[in-house]
Amino acid sequence: MDILTGAVNLLYLSQKRVNASTAKRGYSEEKWVASYIENDFRVNDDRRSKVDLTNGHMNIQVKKSKARQFQQISRGTVDSLVSVIPNLQPIESLLKERCEHKKYFDPCIIETLNASKREILEHALLGHGDLKPDVLCITEWDKRDATRKKIMFVAMKDVIESLMQYDFSIRDSKTVVELGPSFTFQRKGGDGGRKSANDIQFKIVPSLLDVTYPVVIHLTH
């Protein structure tokens, strides 16, 4: 809760931003959030990190989303995934069967996935290296992508703990693995047939995250 208390302290300005819900042309979402919360936050130049904003004391990841919309949080090769989570080695070939050879996910992967659940979540949400996000910031837009409806801050540790209550399962399509209603992974696909289409892609639905004590500000004109 210390991180969320800090986030609450940042948001003294909810009445101050009378036009905060209006999209500003030319502004990336990260720049807009940095401007909104002030407190010396700046865009992180290291794009390899999952940290979008930092002030040297708190690190924030920003996700622009709509209600029930999936957002990519991580992607990479199966080899890369197994290199950072060695406990997945027993199912490496099965993951490659889906991602590289377009076969269906094999149910045999589930036991190993559940045994490595925390490592998978931390890999997808926090990344690696010294700089990791403390807070997930979600800006939710209307269906027309014209207006911000609200901005929400949640501690990353709470996001991870909320997802830990679920177990992995394979959807009926056999092409997507899910962990509860808001976290999935699959073969990326697309990319014009390039090799990157074989990446394993992790996604979340920010609006369906079941977290305790989020900081939510509804934005009005």
Question: Predicted segment positions?
Answer:
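Nucleic-acid endonuclease domains
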Residues: 1-50, 54-58, 62-221
